[in-house]
């Protein structure tokens, strides 16, 4: 009630969604049902015209099952062009488009190639042919549809980055739905170059110029008290029940995708070998436990491959190398606690853990140790783009980041762009505390720039995010966001 009363404004501005053309940039992991249901809601409330972009022709049947007409679909597929004999890439075209749209092809390709070893073997010419085809198809699509907005839920593939770069260069607004790491709140981002949310920057800049009023202070302090050392996960809005029914549904969805693709995924390891390896490593001596009374800085490992590192932390993707730099920069009376991620510990490449464990002042901590307690007792938290940084802010702990993440806009965060400056940054932040008053202002800015609702993928929240109530929340939030960001 307090939040709604404090931040909800009656905006009498023009309806920025009515009669607009939307391009829905679809993808896997539950994005399709969220986007199709949200599109239907906007069609009924704001009379939008929806088009759907897919990068796989196998999804044709899937979209049919959602009631989407094929004349509303745009498919971009590389198979035909790659089968053309004697085809060579147009190098002049590629260079011209890199300049025109502001990206480097092999920078973006890394997002794709790092996911499977087989992709690293794709020839140079084939990569350029794929990119050339993708760029041309997007240009044709934009010319034919002329969308007003493009909507994405997390960019995780190289096509998503190309789409974003091209559409923004062509004057088309790209809206990304975001989970702001505040339970039952959502926001949007239309500046994915830096991962700094424009509305958050706007609200935080205003708050820095004044004192908090009593109600704002109360809300921010209650949020810190409610946090109380609990972790905020992207799917934490609704507890995910793992039942026989949910397991069956998961495997049914997998089987449906395989059926439409008419081929197995590139690797069956996630389904067959990794669950066995999980159990073996859980009880192995590879990982250590924290030691009482030991001073340490904390670095939680990221899941890889993932957009958090391949896109937003691309200069620091080699985590063992980054940990080695941290180990060289920390005073000799401190250890570095490197905690493995509970969802990634059995899927690391060969030699990954060995590189970390051979550093004498580093402990490789078990993935099952409580992350929040590690942050709470650390002298410093270092992360590329992790949620651990946001959680540490709430505990007024010092944080150093290396990548692009929303909380970098907070004045108390130290972002290291030049690794040669890391030693000085650690010395500056080690064993300090974040000013609580500044923390309360940043939390207030977070609330002021977010909206009631759930941005979690349906499969992670028992489909609550596609309930009628939540879809209405997203639509209202989108309208308010666009009005406020343009005012």
Question: Regions from the language model: what does each represent?
Answer:
Residues 3-7, 40-138, 179-278:
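Conserved N-terminal ligand/cofactor-binding loop architecture of enzyme catalytic domains
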Residues 15-29, 151, 301-304:
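Nucleotide-activated donor-dependent transferases that construct or modify glycoconjugates
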Residues 55, 114, 179, 297-306, ...:
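Short loop/turn segments at strand-loop or loop-helix junctions that form parts
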Residues 136-198:
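Conserved nucleotide-sugar donor-interacting segment of glycosyltransferase catalytic cores
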Residues 152-153, 367-414:
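A donor-sugar binding/catalytic signature common to diverse glycosyltransferases
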Residues 198-247, 414-487:
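Leloir-type glycosyltransferase catalytic cores
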Residues 291-327, 340-343, 447-454, 458:
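Active-site donor-nucleotide binding/catalytic segment of nucleotide-sugar enzymes
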Residues 324-366:
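Catalytic donor nucleotide-activated moiety binding site of glycosyltransferases and closely related
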